[in-house]
Amino acid sequence: MDQTIQYFNSEEAARILNVNVSSIKRWTEDGTLECVKTVGGHRKFTMQHLAKFLEEHKTKTTRANLFPIESEEDLEINTRILKADFAFLIDYVSDQSRQCHRDRVHRVFNGLYLAQHPLHEIYDQLVTPVLQRNGDLWEQGQITIVEEHFSTQTIRDCLIRLQGIIQIPSEKIGTAFCLIMSQELHDVAIKMVDHILELKGYQILFSGQMTPSMKIEKIFELYHPDRVYISSTIVTDVNLTQAEFDKICYIAQAHGARVFVGGQGFNQIDFSHPAVEKRLGTFEEVYLS
């Protein structure tokens, strides 16, 4: 088995799904619940297996334990997830992410997704407020820049892990090019845009930070994106960023691609180019775009 993947045994899967072990055995034997078997014949389950089961068999488990229960604290977190208590979860994830507790943050993200919360809701109601919270705490001098960076990178890593349990449509509905400007250092938001669009069925072209050597024209010639998503959080060089943005819009327009923008950086950038379809303010708007 892949040692980089988290596996649960039958007892742990039963606790998560809030059923007895005999139900787990029955469901695996009749093919309702997928699993992998070790050389010794033991059943092992991944979050993908449990997520697929919950999505396809909602009536079989009415109150799943969405956060693996190992302590009283775990029970509390599970209850907060079931109640969608985002105010509590923002505090919890903010604190855990600053301490680089990836496993704790990852479990909250997984739990919310297993509870059938849309990805854009998790991003709007939890991830974005946590990032803003820690940014504000740093500006106020209540945490160090290192702690703020710890939080951001922990969240980024956990978002990538979360994407691993999501079922992506095999049939593609278009191609989306996601990027940030050359002076932009914040790529978490555009990564969340990437994940939402992939969930919708788009083939994703993710370049991250634009560089001077990047031939934008070649990307359009080779991959033919029909949408471009650009995120900007902080603009340090307005003239350079404006020039880069205008160039992208010009090329996108020439190839018939629509441009979507988002982030506070666009308060400083003129985005009135005719290629721009809309400025997006939430991840729900990304999903609906």
Regions found by a protein language model. Name each.
Residues 10, 30-31:
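Extended non-core architectural segments that shape protein topology and connectivity
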Residues 16, 21-23, 32-167:
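Long amphipathic alpha-helical segments
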Residues 1-23:
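Polyanion-binding surface elements
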Residues 27:
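Residues in the recognition helix of alpha-helical DNA-binding motifs
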Residues 141-144, 150-289:
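C-terminal regulatory/effector modules of DNA-binding transcriptional regulators
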Residues 7, 20-21, 105, 190, ...:
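Generic non-transmembrane alpha-helix signal with a bias for helix starts/N-cap capping motifs
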Residues 1, 14-15, 99, 184, ...:
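Residue-level marker of alpha-helix boundaries and capping positions
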